[in-house]
Amino acid sequence: MSTARFIKCVTVGDGAVGKTCMLISYTSNTFPTDYVPTVFDNFSANVVVDGSTVNLGLWDTAGQEDYNRLRPLSYRGADVFLLAFSLISKASYENIYKKWIPELRHYAHNVPVVLVGTKLDLRDDKQFLIDHPGATPISTSQGEELKKMIGAVTYIECSSKTQQNVKAVFDAAIKVALRPPKPKRKPCKRRTCAFL
């Protein structure tokens, strides 16, 4: 009997985008109603994907700037990153390429990224958008465009509250970690010799 392969999956993104809620929703099928910054403990579970058992280790990180020095310590040994932004926050969307991709490429440049748009249930919630005039909905096409811009392997939108696509996020992360994309090879420059 072979031992299960361990996959370290690290969630990254701005504070309050829903990283912890997504992890709690996935691991316990419940949605926390109160916002408590980064209270999720590291979690490990055996998961069967495509007939193979993997031990999935989930690591939560704090997005707040107070943790800029500590957060990268959790990146070591990561097999895949879940890079999250809120589908109702333009600032969190822009920080994907302004802050998070530069940080991930600096500390873990070869680790694949799954881009995740969270709070899908609120994007089309007219009452929420009326009550929160600062909320700016991000479209699916904007998410796909961002995926291409940052070189993410895939893009998934989810709602931790309704659990829509939450399992799909983690299934994608596992599949990406098991079969990471081949790095793009740079074309070789042909060297020419000139005999004089």
UniProtKB/Swiss-Prot annotation:
It is a peripheral membrane protein. GO terms for molecular function: GTP binding; GTPase activity; protein kinase binding. Residues 194-196 form a propeptide. A motif (Effector region) lies at residues 35-43. GO terms for cellular component: cell projection; cytoplasmic vesicle; cytoskeleton; plasma membrane. SUPFAM superfamilies: P-loop containing nucleoside triphosphate hydrolases (SSF52540). The keyword GTP-binding applies. It is found in: Cytoplasm; Membrane. Pfam families: Ras (PF00071). GTP binds at residues 13-20, 60-64, 118-121. InterPro entries: P-loop_NTPase, Small_GTP-bd, Small_GTPase, Small_GTPase_Rho. Belongs to the small GTPase superfamily. Rho family. PANTHER family: RHO FAMILY GTPASE. This is Rac-like GTP-binding protein RAC13. The lineage of its organism: Eukaryota, Viridiplantae, Streptophyta, Embryophyta, Tracheophyta.
